[in-house]
Amino acid sequence: MNELFSIAGKVAVITGAGGVLGGNIAQHFVQQGAKVVAIDIRQEQLDNRVAELKQYGNDVIGIIGNVLDIASLEKVAEEVVAKWGQIDILLNIAGGNMPGATLEPEQHFYDMDISCWEKVTNLNMNGTVYPSMIFGKVMAKQKKGCIINVSSMAA
């Protein structure tokens, strides 16, 4: 039964891996023997996270990627397939919030900053759809793969 749910040797692409949630999940995957591709748009956070993850295993690479940029995601997919030959798991974790897109208890819905709301909605919706399209295409060619979408209260 344990082999059925094992991720050992699986190639897992994790968006938002430089953040707390993505980083913690990436750590768990590395500890379970997965090959982890940590993706984040923030270079410093990504570098720090990859260094931390390598304490648990060497099958970790960090790639700068923007979940809202199809060309960036296609490049990541090509790099991953070139290195490990497959993509087994996509974890869509990148997302978040920003000031102005949420309401304080005393604020009204009509007081919300529309431009902030649109940016947050774009990140949290399209930032899940675009990676799913690009990495899902690789998985479809392989005839196997798993896409996991994760969100938080901040999103």
Where would I find each of the regions flagged by the language model?
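Canonical Rossmann dinucleotide-binding motif of NAD(H)/NADP(H)-dependent dehydrogenases/reductases
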Residues: 5-37
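Conserved glycine-rich Rossmann-like NAD(P)H-binding loop of the short-chain dehydrogenase/reductase
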Residues: 32-48
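The beta1-alpha1 cofactor-binding region of Rossmann-like NAD(H)/NADP(H)-dependent oxidoreductases
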Residues: 43-44, 64-76, 114
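Active-site Tyr-X3-Lys motif and surrounding loop/helix of classical short-chain dehydrogenase/reductase
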Residues: 75-82, 101-111, 115-122
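Catalytic Tyr-X3-Lys loop
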Residues: 88, 96, 110-129, 144, ...
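A short, exposed helix-loop element centered on a Lys and neighboring polar residues
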Residues: 132-133
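Residue(s) in the substrate-gating loop at a strand-loop-helix junction
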Residues: 152
